[in-house]
Amino acid sequence: MNIGKYIFAQVIDFIPRYQFDKLVKKYKGDWHAKELTCYNQLLQLLFGQITGCDSLRDICMCLEAHNGILYHLGIRKYVTHSSLSRANENRDYHIYEELGMYLIGIVRPMYSNTKVAEITIDNVLYALDSTTISTSIVLAAWALGKYSKGAVKMHTLLDLRGSIPANIHITDGKWHDSNELDEIVPEPLAFYMMDKAYVDFLALFRFHKADAYWISRPKDNMRYEVIDHRHDFDPSTGICGDFTIKLTTHKSKKLYPEPIRMVTYHDSETGNDVEFITNNLEISALEVANLYRHRWDIEVFFYDKYIVMRSYPDCNTDNHGFTELLLR
């Protein structure tokens, strides 16, 4: 009796097989492969992600238990835990990274006109942040973190129109967040929202010269002088001040010689005054505050996706770790 197509089989129909096979050929992923091809590896890891398996061993046991229907799921054959682990270690993770970027390139235009709450401008909006995943430095020596601990960082540039990652960069835990700005090609007229950890005036000035806009918060040790005041704001909205400032220390004003805008906002929920800095002098002060508030959308994204490496005890190489992270 035909009961229809399994949901998992319907999901994997969206994988562009032609493009995937091109990437496998490019990176020689199926070199000497017999039963566990790159495509079969991809399906098994996706199966584990969708079904909430906690480790590679769980994936293999679950697939073995459903051996009779694997063909209908689109999976050729289940493999042992050791075979799947070796495939993750040895097959170039760039295969799955470039597949992900290809799919993102298809999906992002579909949401390019999505409205963002309380935002009136039509510019491209990005939120930049990272999430840190703890691991054992003994079992994953490649994942160096602070204080002799193991950690991996996933730096994500999130397109706020649709909450779709525009770029993902995986590093060890010692990679400072501000270094990530050097990995990004600024998009003219786009807004980049980031917290104060990303305040690197040399990198931010590069964004400014590329006609891209950034919004962040000042560090506690930032020294500046006020050179202009603006009064075109409604205090009832929470805006307390709108200034144009200039950096005063020798190093900072050399790195960023142009004026910067500073907006002060009173948060009625916490009772605190919050300061924002930006290179955009045109939008309203309230728009600046609302844009930065949407930086929290990326925190929600990390929480919703539950970015954890459940099977990190298996990840004894960076290639293994990157492969599993990219497929989660």
Stretches with model-predicted labels:
Residues S55, L73-R76:
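Short, surface-exposed helix-loop/turn micro-motifs enriched in polar/charged residues
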Residues M1-D58, C62, R91, E98, ...:
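Single, function-defining residue in the core of a domain
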Residues H66-G74:
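Extended, structured, electrostatic nucleic-acid-contact surfaces
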Residues R76-A141:
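Active-site- or DNA-interface-adjacent structural scaffold in DNA-acting proteins
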Residues A143-G145:
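Extracellular beta-strand-rich solenoid/capping regions of secreted or surface-exposed proteins
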